[in-house]
């Protein structure tokens, strides 16, 4: 398969690009230049790998979920344990890389958006480590859902700005973070949390997250002497999935499955299934599939999981859908909750609600596969942050 994206202008087929105001163009080009240089600099790579190993705690285990496998029948189920990273999710793979990039570029301050709070915590964490000032924008609704993560960020020295505009969720937080960046661009780096935004952000985030898929390949081959037949990951903006999928893109014998949030159901207005129900448009500097109405107004996304309710999806996922290399599906709030409880009871592992969407789809897929086949789930984060809201949700039902 001939797959080499993005092109030199930052496009993934028709997707991606740089739809930014003139005031940001210089910074985006400067970032691209700095990133290319860093990727070719052995000292930068050495420093990044040092932190990934000694600070983040990589590599993360590839765990054979024996009880889940027995319960499902069919394929052997493996979990890539990103929940065991420092700060409890995959997000830090990207924030440590970008923070080192910010230091390299001479920036003193970092701005970021966050939905579930995981990216905010991971950003505040690396800023504390590297002595950078940190400002985090978070939607009002997400602040309510994720009080503990807000307190964590503040403990780490970050200033958390609550965003009341719009639906008070991730989309609105990104808007405000971009506005802030425009007016502080001389001394501030924007750490985008997913494979979104203008080029080079989708590529930078994908490349820093590719450690997930690269490790998985190596670990699975060491255990089974081959590659897995299927790989499953959840998708909001799509960074854990892109990090897992990208190293497998050329291995056409490996089926790749992306799982979006169907919320209350894709037939309702309350979902975040962008690739299932969306259409092409531009948001936050990039062309991609979006949830929008006929006038092109962005619709609110809904999911029980704060990290999946973004109304767009990364440009590379948009392309991978169109060319059929990744198969995209969606899982409802109720199915994700069920999978959350099942994994907790069967394996003693409490997954994030985001990751529970991937687990739920894997539960449907595994029984359709043969016993000598393997299925890897990207367990993108741990569920501590969700326990309180799940308790509330279960009491209401």
Swiss-Prot record:
Gene Ontology cellular component terms for the protein in this record: cytoplasm
InterPro entries: Trp_synth_b_CS, Trp_synth_beta, Trp_synth_beta/beta-like, TrpB-like_PALP, TrpB-like_PALP_sf
Modified residues annotated as N6-(pyridoxal phosphate)lysine in this record: 91
UniProt keyword list: Amino-acid biosynthesis, Aromatic amino acid biosynthesis, Lyase, Pyridoxal phosphate, Tryptophan biosynthesis
Pathway membership, UniProt: Amino-acid biosynthesis; L-tryptophan biosynthesis; L-tryptophan from chorismate: step 5/5
Protein task: The beta subunit is responsible for the synthesis of L-tryptophan from indole and L-serine.
Name of the protein described by the UniProt record: Tryptophan synthase beta chain
Lineage per the UniProt record: Bacteria, Bacillati, Bacillota, Bacilli, Bacillales
């Amino acid at each position: 398969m001939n797959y080499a994206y993005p092109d030199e202008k930052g496009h993934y087929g028709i997707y991606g690009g740089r739809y930014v105001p003139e005031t940001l163009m210089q910074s985006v080009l400067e970032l691209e230049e700095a990133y290319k240089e860093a990727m070719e600099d052995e000292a930068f790579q050495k420093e990044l790998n040092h932190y990934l190993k000694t600070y983040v705690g990589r590599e993360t285990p590839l765990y054979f979920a024996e009880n889940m496998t027995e319960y499902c029948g069919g394929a052997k189920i493996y979990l890539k344990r990103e929940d065991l990273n420092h700060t409890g999710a995959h997000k830090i793979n990207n924030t440590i890389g970008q923070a080192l990039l910010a230091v390299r570029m001479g920036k003193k301050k970092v701005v970021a958006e966050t939905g579930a709070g995981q990216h905010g915590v991971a950003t505040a964490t690396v800023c504390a480590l590297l002595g950078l000032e940190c400002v985090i924008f978070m939607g009002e609704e997400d602040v309510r859902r994720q009080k503990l993560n807000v307190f964590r960020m503040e403990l780490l020295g970050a200033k958390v700005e609550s965003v009341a505009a719009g639906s008070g969720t991730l989309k609105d937080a990104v808007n405000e973070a971009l506005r802030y960046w425009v007016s502080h661009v001389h001394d501030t780096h924007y750490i985008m949390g997913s494979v979104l935004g203008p080029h080079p952000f989708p590529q930078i985030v994908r490349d820093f997250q590719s450690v997930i898929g690269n490790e998985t390949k190596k670990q699975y081959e060491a255990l089974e002497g081959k590659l897995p037949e299927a790989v499953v990951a959840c998708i909001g903006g799509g960074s854990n999935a892109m990090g897992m999928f990208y190293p497998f893109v050329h291995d056409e014998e490996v089926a790749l499955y992306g799982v979006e949030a169907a919320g209350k159901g894709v037939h309702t207005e309350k979902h975040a299934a962008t690739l299932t129900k969306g259409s092409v448009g531009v948001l936050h500097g990039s062309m991609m599939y979006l949830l929008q109405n006929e006038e092109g107004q962005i619709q609110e996304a809904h999911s029980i999981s704060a990290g999946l309710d973004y109304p767009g999806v990364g440009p590379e996922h948009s392309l991978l859908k169109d060319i059929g290399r990744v198969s995209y599906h969606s899982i409802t709030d109720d199915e994700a909750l069920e999978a959350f409880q099942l994994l907790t009871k069967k394996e003693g592992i409490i997954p994030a609600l985001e990751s529970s969407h991937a687990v739920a789809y894997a539960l449907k897929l595994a029984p359709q596969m043969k016993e000598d086949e393997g299925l890897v789930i990207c367990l993108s984060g741990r569920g501590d942050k969700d326990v309180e809201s799940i308790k509330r949700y279960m009491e209401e039902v």
